[in-house]
């Protein structure tokens, strides 16, 4: 009984020190990585898929041919003047994302360096005059380039960065950037 009396205040003190999970309830989820890292250094937040509609600068056929997968759905972000486009596979998973940024040169370069960090990516200079990087990731590949105040970044679920590069070049051409 004496142990119980001494143990009760210790338990009460420890209970106030951390999160509590009660059996049979959902555990609290940690903050998402996009919340913490997407706005690092004052960069615009990562785009989020919104309305289901055609991408205004890339057709589904172009993406299907470049990425080698059928496109079942396209969603676009609310970003303006150029929304990010999310292309989905038939199983409902994103196969390719294209983000276009037009603003100031420092932010454009920072977005490219965030997507394809200088120290871990291969240099990219295609199309002519654009600079950035490409790399394979655990989920596929990224190709990201900037020129002046514009940046175009493509992420694919395919390991070959040439697929993302092809889409970036098509987007740049369609938008006349």
Question: Residue locations for each model-derived region?
Answer:
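Extracytoplasmic low-complexity, Pro/Thr/Ser/Ala/Gly-rich segments
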Residues: 25-91, 172
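A short, solvent-exposed beta-edge/loop patch
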Residues: 43-50, 123-177
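Amphipathic alpha-helical interface surfaces
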Residues: 59, 107-108, 167
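Bacterial signal peptide processing site
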Residues: 17-21
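Short, solvent-exposed recognition patches
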Residues: 70-129
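Sec-dependent bacterial lipoprotein signal peptides
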Residues: 1-15
């Amino acid at each position: 009984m004496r142990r119980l009396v001494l143990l009760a205040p210790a338990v009460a003190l420890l209970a106030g020190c951390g999160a509590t999970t009660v059996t049979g309830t959902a555990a609290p989820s940690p903050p998402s990585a996009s919340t913490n890292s997407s706005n690092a250094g004052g960069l615009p937040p990562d785009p989020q898929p919104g309305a289901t509609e055609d991408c205004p600068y890339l057709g589904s056929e172009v993406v299907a041919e470049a990425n080698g997968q059928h496109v079942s759905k396209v969603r676009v972000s609310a970003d303006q003047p150029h929304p990010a486009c999310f292309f989905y596979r038939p199983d409902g998973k994103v196969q390719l994302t294209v983000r276009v940024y037009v603003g100031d040169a420092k932010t454009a370069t920072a977005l490219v360096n965030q997507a394809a960090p200088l120290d871990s990516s291969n240099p990219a200079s295609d199309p002519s005059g654009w600079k950035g990087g490409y790399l394979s990731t655990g989920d596929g590949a990224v190709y990201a380039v900037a020129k002046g105040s514009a940046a175009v970044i493509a992420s694919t679920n395919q390991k070959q960065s040439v697929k993302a590069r092809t889409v970036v070049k098509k987007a740049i051409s369609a938008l006349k950037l």
